[in-house]
A protein has these predicted regions:
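N-terminal pre-P-loop "Q-motif" helix
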Residues: 1-12
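Walker A/P-loop nucleotide-binding motif
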Residues: 18-36
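Sensor-1/coupling segment of RecA-like P-loop NTPase cores
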Residues: 26, 105-141, 145
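Conserved catalytic segments around the Walker B and adjacent sensor/switch elements
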Residues: 43-56
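Conserved NTP-binding/hydrolysis module of P-loop NTPases
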Residues: 56-76
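Conserved P-loop NTPase "ATPase switch" module shared by AAA+ and STAND
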Residues: 86-110
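C-terminal alpha-helical "lid" subdomain
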Residues: 152, 156, 168-278
Length: 278
Protein backbone atom coordinates (compact mmCIF):
# COMPACT_ATOMS: atom_id res chain seq x y z
CA UNK A 1 0.00 0.00 0.00
CA UNK A 2 2.79 2.43 0.89
CA UNK A 3 4.50 1.78 -2.44
CA UNK A 4 1.24 2.35 -4.29
CA UNK A 5 0.68 5.64 -2.47
CA UNK A 6 4.25 6.78 -3.15
CA UNK A 7 3.80 6.09 -6.85
CA UNK A 8 0.49 7.94 -6.89
CA UNK A 9 2.00 10.88 -5.00
CA UNK A 10 4.91 11.12 -7.45
CA UNK A 11 2.53 11.00 -10.41
CA UNK A 12 0.26 13.68 -8.96
CA UNK A 13 3.21 15.92 -8.12
CA UNK A 14 4.48 15.80 -11.70
CA UNK A 15 1.07 16.54 -13.15
CA UNK A 16 0.46 19.44 -10.76
CA UNK A 17 3.80 20.99 -11.62
CA UNK A 18 2.72 20.86 -15.27
CA UNK A 19 -0.33 22.92 -14.33
CA UNK A 20 -2.96 20.20 -14.56
CA UNK A 21 -6.23 20.34 -12.64
CA UNK A 22 -7.13 17.08 -10.88
CA UNK A 23 -9.90 15.80 -8.63
CA UNK A 24 -8.95 13.13 -6.10
CA UNK A 25 -12.12 11.10 -5.59
CA UNK A 26 -12.64 8.60 -2.81
CA UNK A 27 -14.85 7.67 0.14
CA UNK A 28 -14.55 9.47 3.45
CA UNK A 29 -11.76 8.03 5.55
CA UNK A 30 -9.76 6.68 2.61
CA UNK A 31 -6.69 8.85 3.28
CA UNK A 32 -7.14 11.70 0.81
CA UNK A 33 -6.24 14.38 3.35
CA UNK A 34 -3.05 12.58 4.35
CA UNK A 35 -2.05 12.26 0.70
CA UNK A 36 -2.55 15.99 0.14
CA UNK A 37 -0.46 16.77 3.22
CA UNK A 38 2.30 14.48 1.94
CA UNK A 39 2.21 16.24 -1.41
CA UNK A 40 2.42 19.58 0.34
CA UNK A 41 5.48 18.38 2.24
CA UNK A 42 7.18 17.24 -0.98
CA UNK A 43 6.80 20.52 -2.83
CA UNK A 44 9.24 23.33 -2.21
CA UNK A 45 7.45 26.68 -1.91
CA UNK A 46 10.74 28.57 -2.08
CA UNK A 47 10.79 27.71 -5.79
CA UNK A 48 7.18 26.66 -6.40
CA UNK A 49 4.38 28.74 -4.85
CA UNK A 50 2.19 26.24 -3.01
CA UNK A 51 -0.63 26.29 -0.45
CA UNK A 52 -2.79 23.69 1.31
CA UNK A 53 -6.39 24.54 2.25
CA UNK A 54 -7.88 22.21 4.88
CA UNK A 55 -11.46 23.09 3.89
CA UNK A 56 -12.60 24.44 0.52
CA UNK A 57 -16.27 25.33 0.33
CA UNK A 58 -16.24 28.88 -1.04
CA UNK A 59 -14.49 31.12 -3.51
CA UNK A 60 -12.86 32.98 -0.63
CA UNK A 61 -11.19 29.77 0.56
CA UNK A 62 -9.53 29.50 -2.86
CA UNK A 63 -8.59 33.18 -2.70
CA UNK A 64 -7.03 32.72 0.74
CA UNK A 65 -5.03 29.76 -0.55
CA UNK A 66 -3.68 31.86 -3.41
CA UNK A 67 -2.78 34.65 -0.99
CA UNK A 68 -0.72 32.17 1.02
CA UNK A 69 0.92 30.76 -2.11
CA UNK A 70 1.83 34.29 -3.28
CA UNK A 71 2.55 36.22 -0.06
CA UNK A 72 4.32 38.95 -2.01
CA UNK A 73 1.06 40.07 -3.60
CA UNK A 74 -0.49 42.92 -1.62
CA UNK A 75 -4.25 42.37 -1.35
CA UNK A 76 -4.88 44.65 1.61
CA UNK A 77 -7.50 47.37 1.31
CA UNK A 78 -8.96 46.16 -1.99
CA UNK A 79 -12.01 44.10 -2.90
CA UNK A 80 -11.74 40.33 -3.06
CA UNK A 81 -12.43 40.47 -6.78
CA UNK A 82 -9.53 42.86 -7.28
CA UNK A 83 -7.39 40.66 -5.06
CA UNK A 84 -8.13 37.64 -7.24
CA UNK A 85 -7.08 39.59 -10.31
CA UNK A 86 -3.73 40.46 -8.73
CA UNK A 87 -3.23 36.88 -7.61
CA UNK A 88 -4.11 35.55 -11.06
CA UNK A 89 -1.50 37.86 -12.60
CA UNK A 90 1.08 36.57 -10.11
CA UNK A 91 0.21 32.96 -10.94
CA UNK A 92 0.40 33.73 -14.64
CA UNK A 93 3.94 34.97 -14.08
CA UNK A 94 5.03 32.08 -11.84
CA UNK A 95 2.94 28.93 -11.90
CA UNK A 96 2.07 27.45 -8.52
CA UNK A 97 0.13 24.59 -6.95
CA UNK A 98 -3.05 24.62 -4.85
CA UNK A 99 -4.03 21.62 -2.73
CA UNK A 100 -7.71 22.00 -1.86
CA UNK A 101 -8.91 19.52 0.74
CA UNK A 102 -12.56 18.88 1.68
CA UNK A 103 -13.68 20.41 -1.62
CA UNK A 104 -17.49 20.55 -1.66
CA UNK A 105 -20.48 22.66 -2.54
CA UNK A 106 -18.84 23.98 -5.68
CA UNK A 107 -20.56 27.21 -6.70
CA UNK A 108 -20.57 28.68 -10.18
CA UNK A 109 -18.18 31.39 -8.92
CA UNK A 110 -15.71 28.77 -7.65
CA UNK A 111 -15.84 26.81 -10.89
CA UNK A 112 -15.52 29.94 -13.02
CA UNK A 113 -12.40 31.09 -11.17
CA UNK A 114 -10.82 27.62 -11.27
CA UNK A 115 -11.36 27.62 -15.03
CA UNK A 116 -9.34 30.83 -15.21
CA UNK A 117 -6.49 29.08 -13.38
CA UNK A 118 -6.58 26.22 -15.88
CA UNK A 119 -4.21 25.92 -18.82
CA UNK A 120 -0.86 25.96 -17.02
CA UNK A 121 -1.58 28.94 -14.75
CA UNK A 122 -1.83 26.96 -11.49
CA UNK A 123 -1.87 23.24 -10.80
CA UNK A 124 -4.89 22.34 -8.65
CA UNK A 125 -5.68 19.13 -6.78
CA UNK A 126 -9.12 19.02 -5.15
CA UNK A 127 -9.97 16.21 -2.72
CA UNK A 128 -13.65 15.30 -3.07
CA UNK A 129 -15.63 12.86 -0.92
CA UNK A 130 -17.53 10.33 -3.02
CA UNK A 131 -19.31 7.58 -1.10
CA UNK A 132 -22.14 6.73 -3.46
CA UNK A 133 -23.44 7.14 -6.99
CA UNK A 134 -25.43 10.26 -6.11
CA UNK A 135 -22.28 12.06 -4.95
CA UNK A 136 -20.44 10.83 -8.04
CA UNK A 137 -23.13 12.31 -10.29
CA UNK A 138 -22.92 15.54 -8.32
CA UNK A 139 -19.23 15.85 -9.13
CA UNK A 140 -19.92 15.48 -12.86
CA UNK A 141 -22.05 18.62 -12.80
CA UNK A 142 -19.13 20.95 -11.98
CA UNK A 143 -15.91 19.14 -12.92
CA UNK A 144 -15.06 21.90 -15.51
CA UNK A 145 -12.50 19.71 -17.32
CA UNK A 146 -10.46 18.62 -14.31
CA UNK A 147 -9.29 15.01 -14.62
CA UNK A 148 -10.53 12.50 -12.05
CA UNK A 149 -8.09 10.39 -10.04
CA UNK A 150 -9.40 7.58 -7.85
CA UNK A 151 -7.98 7.28 -4.33
CA UNK A 152 -6.75 3.68 -4.03
CA UNK A 153 -8.30 1.50 -1.35
CA UNK A 154 -6.29 -0.92 0.76
CA UNK A 155 -6.63 -4.67 0.44
CA UNK A 156 -8.06 -6.71 3.30
CA UNK A 157 -4.58 -8.03 4.11
CA UNK A 158 -3.13 -4.52 4.22
CA UNK A 159 -5.93 -3.29 6.46
CA UNK A 160 -5.53 -6.26 8.80
CA UNK A 161 -1.82 -5.57 9.18
CA UNK A 162 -2.52 -1.90 9.90
CA UNK A 163 -5.25 -2.77 12.41
CA UNK A 164 -3.06 -5.18 14.36
CA UNK A 165 -0.02 -2.88 14.27
CA UNK A 166 -1.99 0.08 15.57
CA UNK A 167 -3.78 -1.98 18.21
CA UNK A 168 -0.43 -3.20 19.53
CA UNK A 169 1.16 0.27 19.38
CA UNK A 170 -1.77 1.86 21.23
CA UNK A 171 -1.82 -0.86 23.88
CA UNK A 172 -5.31 -2.13 23.06
CA UNK A 173 -6.40 -5.55 24.32
CA UNK A 174 -5.79 -8.35 21.82
CA UNK A 175 -8.44 -8.48 19.08
CA UNK A 176 -9.74 -11.93 18.17
CA UNK A 177 -10.35 -13.09 14.60
CA UNK A 178 -14.08 -12.36 14.63
CA UNK A 179 -13.58 -8.82 15.92
CA UNK A 180 -10.92 -8.15 13.28
CA UNK A 181 -13.17 -9.50 10.54
CA UNK A 182 -16.06 -7.25 11.53
CA UNK A 183 -13.85 -4.15 11.73
CA UNK A 184 -12.24 -4.88 8.36
CA UNK A 185 -15.65 -5.38 6.75
CA UNK A 186 -16.83 -2.02 8.10
CA UNK A 187 -13.64 -0.29 6.93
CA UNK A 188 -14.26 -1.21 3.26
CA UNK A 189 -10.67 -0.59 2.26
CA UNK A 190 -10.36 2.80 3.99
CA UNK A 191 -7.06 3.29 5.80
CA UNK A 192 -8.28 6.44 7.54
CA UNK A 193 -11.26 4.53 8.91
CA UNK A 194 -8.95 2.04 10.64
CA UNK A 195 -6.86 4.89 12.06
CA UNK A 196 -9.94 6.63 13.46
CA UNK A 197 -11.39 3.34 14.75
CA UNK A 198 -8.27 2.48 16.75
CA UNK A 199 -8.15 6.01 18.16
CA UNK A 200 -11.72 5.68 19.40
CA UNK A 201 -11.08 2.18 20.74
CA UNK A 202 -8.70 3.63 23.31
CA UNK A 203 -11.70 4.91 25.26
CA UNK A 204 -13.04 2.70 28.01
CA UNK A 205 -16.66 3.19 27.01
CA UNK A 206 -16.18 0.84 24.06
CA UNK A 207 -15.18 -2.11 26.24
CA UNK A 208 -16.96 -4.54 28.51
CA UNK A 209 -15.69 -7.53 30.46
CA UNK A 210 -16.50 -9.83 27.53
CA UNK A 211 -14.64 -7.65 25.02
CA UNK A 212 -15.15 -4.69 22.69
CA UNK A 213 -18.54 -3.35 21.63
CA UNK A 214 -17.75 -3.78 17.95
CA UNK A 215 -21.08 -2.51 16.59
CA UNK A 216 -20.84 0.66 18.67
CA UNK A 217 -17.23 1.26 17.66
CA UNK A 218 -18.13 0.84 13.99
CA UNK A 219 -21.11 3.20 14.19
CA UNK A 220 -19.15 5.87 16.05
CA UNK A 221 -16.18 5.57 13.70
CA UNK A 222 -18.39 5.99 10.64
CA UNK A 223 -20.14 8.97 12.20
CA UNK A 224 -16.82 10.52 13.20
CA UNK A 225 -15.37 10.10 9.71
CA UNK A 226 -18.44 11.57 8.04
CA UNK A 227 -18.85 14.46 10.48
CA UNK A 228 -15.19 15.45 10.60
CA UNK A 229 -15.50 17.87 7.69
CA UNK A 230 -18.67 19.40 9.16
CA UNK A 231 -16.81 20.09 12.41
CA UNK A 232 -14.07 21.84 10.45
CA UNK A 233 -16.58 24.13 8.76
CA UNK A 234 -17.28 25.81 12.07
CA UNK A 235 -13.66 26.92 12.45
CA UNK A 236 -11.39 29.07 10.34
CA UNK A 237 -9.98 26.90 7.54
CA UNK A 238 -6.32 26.11 7.90
CA UNK A 239 -4.21 27.31 4.99
CA UNK A 240 -0.53 26.56 4.89
CA UNK A 241 2.28 27.88 2.73
CA UNK A 242 5.90 28.91 3.00
CA UNK A 243 8.94 26.79 3.76
CA UNK A 244 8.01 23.17 4.38
CA UNK A 245 8.59 21.67 7.82
CA UNK A 246 8.53 17.94 7.08
CA UNK A 247 8.17 16.93 10.72
CA UNK A 248 5.15 19.20 11.13
CA UNK A 249 3.50 17.85 8.00
CA UNK A 250 3.99 14.29 9.18
CA UNK A 251 2.62 15.09 12.62
CA UNK A 252 -0.50 16.56 11.04
CA UNK A 253 -1.28 13.22 9.39
CA UNK A 254 -0.38 11.14 12.44
CA UNK A 255 -3.05 9.77 14.76
CA UNK A 256 -4.11 12.12 17.51
CA UNK A 257 -3.61 11.46 21.18
CA UNK A 258 -6.02 9.24 23.02
CA UNK A 259 -6.48 12.06 25.53
CA UNK A 260 -8.93 13.55 23.05
CA UNK A 261 -11.38 10.82 23.98
CA UNK A 262 -11.00 10.85 27.76
CA UNK A 263 -10.22 7.43 29.29
CA UNK A 264 -7.23 5.74 27.64
CA UNK A 265 -7.01 1.96 27.43
CA UNK A 266 -3.35 2.12 26.40
CA UNK A 267 -2.43 2.44 30.08
CA UNK A 268 -4.23 -0.80 30.88
CA UNK A 269 -2.24 -3.59 29.30
CA UNK A 270 -4.06 -6.93 29.11
CA UNK A 271 -2.57 -9.95 30.80
CA UNK A 272 -0.51 -12.29 28.65
CA UNK A 273 -2.56 -14.38 26.26
CA UNK A 274 -5.82 -12.62 27.06
CA UNK A 275 -8.19 -12.37 24.13
CA UNK A 276 -11.45 -10.44 24.03
CA UNK A 277 -14.48 -11.57 22.11
CA UNK A 278 -17.60 -9.72 21.08
Amino acid sequence: MQRQLRELSASLEGRLLRGEHLMLLGPRGSGKSSLLQDLYAQLHPQSVPCAFSAVTTSLDHITCALECAYPGVDTRGISRRAARMRLWNAADGQAGVLLLDQFRGASSAMVSFLRRLHGGITGVLSAVDVDDEQERRGVQSWRYGAMSVRMPLASRRQLRRLLLERAAALGLPTLDAMTCARLLAAARGRVGWIVRCTELARHERYWRTHGPLVSVICLDTEADVRCDALKMLGANPEVRSGVIDRSRAESNSAPSSGARYGGDLSTRRPSAGRTHRD
